Structures are given as structure tokens and as C-alpha cells.
């Protein structure tokens, strides 16, 4: 965070920051980043694709200018699901840089005026009609998430990721396993996934998939594991730790190439 603040120089007009660093899972203090940016006259927004649905957000309280995110991760919208945006009220009177008919005032939309009649809210930043099949799953997921409560989801997320890190520390950090944790240990500094590093991360990633575990590989040596609080149990996490151990004990990684041409 200090490096980011140091980069907020007089040459910077707009800062777009990740809420969570996608490799290691570090959670930025978005309130602090907003404050520091505004002190310097910088407009600031956040890409919250890796935090939405697992971390509470208070954009209006923080005064953040804008944010956006996908809904196919913790929001359970599935691949190709509709994305979302937040625009602070203080910007609602501004003209979107790319205005589209779906951002028009609904009452005049079909008058097809030559001049854009803004919807006067974050809706104005919509461009075209969203597809219903890409949006419907999000509605169902939101109902479940409201019932569970984002604070409860966050609490379980911290506990279950903490448990995963504990298992790796206790069982898998020494020889011959040599797994390490790239994710910050402090609760306030981590999001919903754990970055596990290993010199053979790519081959381990493939071995995990073959065993029914769905991780992500990120260069050069990170395996991302994301226990989704809504439906992943502590027993599931324990079983993943056993698989991480077994693929080393049984030499399973030797079955896989180190060729990294595949996209994960």
C-alpha cells in the first residue's frame, strides 16, 4: 500500500486499483486508498472482481468514485455472467464517456432523441441491453447471499482460509512437500482466496485437477485455492490438504508436463 501511495504523484489524474491482488490474495484498504488519492486530487476506482461476494464494501462511506466487478466468481453467476458497476452519486450528473441507449432515461428511451437523456444515476453508464440468461443466475445468488449476510460470509471466509493456511503450515511446509503461503496472515489484509507457492506449481495444478480439485495457476509459482464460504465446508478444505500431500507422496506430479501453454 505504501508503494501505491508513493506512486500517487502530480502526474496521476486517475487511479484504478484492485481491491485484492489477484495472485496472493492481499486485500487493499480501499478506504485508505480513497482518502490518500483524494488528498492529491486523484479520482480513484476499484476492480472488485476478486472481493465482491466475499468482502463487505462501503464505497459511499469511503467516498470512492467508482468500482466495477464481474459476477462469475464468489457471486456464482457462472462464465459469461453480466458485470456490475458502482458510480458515486457525485458523478451522476456527468456525461458517460461512452453513452448507450440503455443508459438513457427510461421514460424517454423510445423517443429516440438525438441527444442523450441521462438516466441520472449509475444506470446511465449502461450501454446496451444485458442478456437475461447471463443475469438471471445472479438474482438467485443474491437472494442466498442476502439471507446469509455478507458479514457472516466474511467471517466464515476468514476462518476457512485460516484453516487452510494452518493445514499447509502444519502438514505441508517442510520436506518433501515444500508448500508455502503467499497470502497475508492478518485477517484485515486478505480476501477470500489463498495463494500457495511451490516450485512445481504448474504440475501440481494439473495433478489437483486430475484429482477433482479445481485450483488456478498463476505464474510463476502460485496455486490459487478459493474455498467459497457459501458451500465449501471445513471438511472439504481438509480433503484438499490431503490431496496436496498425496500428489507429492505418490509422485503424481511426475505424470504431468511443465509446458505452460494451457490457459487456466
Label each PLM-derived region with a short phrase.
Residues 5-6, 207-264:
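PLP-dependent enzyme catalytic core of the Aspartate aminotransferase-like
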Residues 76-81, 86-156, 162:
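Active-site C-terminal subdomain of aminotransferase-like
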Residues 42, 46-48, 52, 58-87:
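Conserved active-site segment immediately N-terminal to the catalytic lysine
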Residues 11, 62-66, 212-213:
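Glycine-enriched alpha-helix->loop->beta-strand junction motifs that scaffold or abut catalytic
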Residues 122-128, 145-197:
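Conserved small-domain helix->loop->beta segment predominantly found in fold-type I
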Residues 197-202, 230-234:
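Helix N-cap motif at beta-to-alpha junctions
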Residues 1-49, 74:
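Active-site phosphate-binding strand-loop segment of PLP-dependent enzymes
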